[in-house]
Amino acid sequence: MTATGPRNGTDAVDVVALGESMVAFRPSRPGRLADVPSFERGIGGAESNAACVLAAAGHSVRWVSRVGADGFGDHLVAAIGSWGVDVGAVGRDPDRPTGVYFRTAGDRATDAHEVAYYRAGSAAAAMSPDTVDTAALRACRVLHLSGITAALSAGCLRLLRELTAPGPGRPLISFDVNFRPALWRDADGPRVLLELARRADLVFVGDDEA
């Protein structure tokens, strides 16, 4: 894929992707997190990954999220924008950090690996109908969401419920279930994800989630 320049604006686009992206640190060589001496910086986020791929394929795409007013937030916005994704609706939070995570290389035979997330209290976890530009979210043909966002906080879940509620002018809803048990603070995860999936027009689900 060839990176292009960032797009910014509030005009209608083909696809809007809403979700947290984090700075990803991957080891310079195989080994446990306790033993690896150095890491290479990248980015990670199911929704922003989809946005970058769609933009590279020629679609007009907007990524909506919140990042910290920090260097990691700057890196995420610049990296995702370099694929031609509209990043003009990404909010900056002066009080909460950008999330990061560390991941070891997977075992070739079993894909076993370690992941350490540092996302609790992140800027993206503070997303809600009050902190996100909902007009920018609705100005599209397709709105792409995921179950990860629903698990981040009560405000994030409230935002997804508002966006998926039936009503005139609602864009087509694309929903990636993306069930991550460790993110849910109670046993309501499957019930909430089923509720959101039933509201969606297009649902992506893995074999282990069906």
What are these model-derived regions, one by one?
Residues 2-5, 87-88, 129-132, 161, ...:
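A generic local structural motif
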Residues 18-21, 26, 67, 120-121, ...:
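Fold-independent oxyanion-binding glycine-rich loops
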Residues 60-147, 173:
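Conserved N-terminal subdomain of the carbohydrate kinase-like
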Residues 42-49, 127-129, 185-188:
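Short secondary-structure boundary/capping elements
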Residues 2-86, 109:
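Glycine-rich phosphate/adenosyl-contacting loop at the front of the ribokinase-like
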Residues 10, 136-138, 194-197:
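A short, aliphatic-rich alpha-helical micro-motif
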Residues 30-33, 77-79, 131-132, 157-160, ...:
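Short, glycine/charged-enriched secondary-structure capping and boundary segments
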Residues 142, 148-210:
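Conserved beta-alpha-beta core of the PfkB/ribokinase-like small-molecule kinase fold
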